UniProtKB/Swiss-Prot annotation:
Membrane topology: Single-pass membrane protein
Name used for this protein in its record: Cytochrome b6-f complex subunit 5
Annotated InterPro entries: Cyt_6/f_cplx_su5, Cyt_6/f_cplx_su5_sf
Gene: petG
Molecular-function GO terms, alphabetical: electron transporter, transferring electrons within cytochrome b6/f complex of photosystem II activity
Pfam families reported in the protein's UniProt record: PetG
SUPFAM superfamilies: PetG subunit of the cytochrome b6f complex
Length: 37
C-alpha cells in the first residue's frame, strides 16, 4: 500500500533534485565568471 506512494515521491524528487543541483552549479559558474576567480 505504501510502495506506490513512496515510488511516486522518489520519482518526483529525483528530477527536482537534479534541477536544483544544475541551477546551483550554473549560478556558481556564473558568479565565478563575474568575479573572474
Amino acid at each position: 500500500m505504501v510502495e506506490p506512494l513512496l515510488s511516486g515521491i522518489v520519482l518526483g524528487l529525483i528530477p527536482v533534485t537534479l534541477i536544483g543541483l544544475f541551477v546551483a552549479a550554473y549560478l556558481q559558474y556564473r558568479r565565478g565568471n563575474q568575479f573572474e576567480f
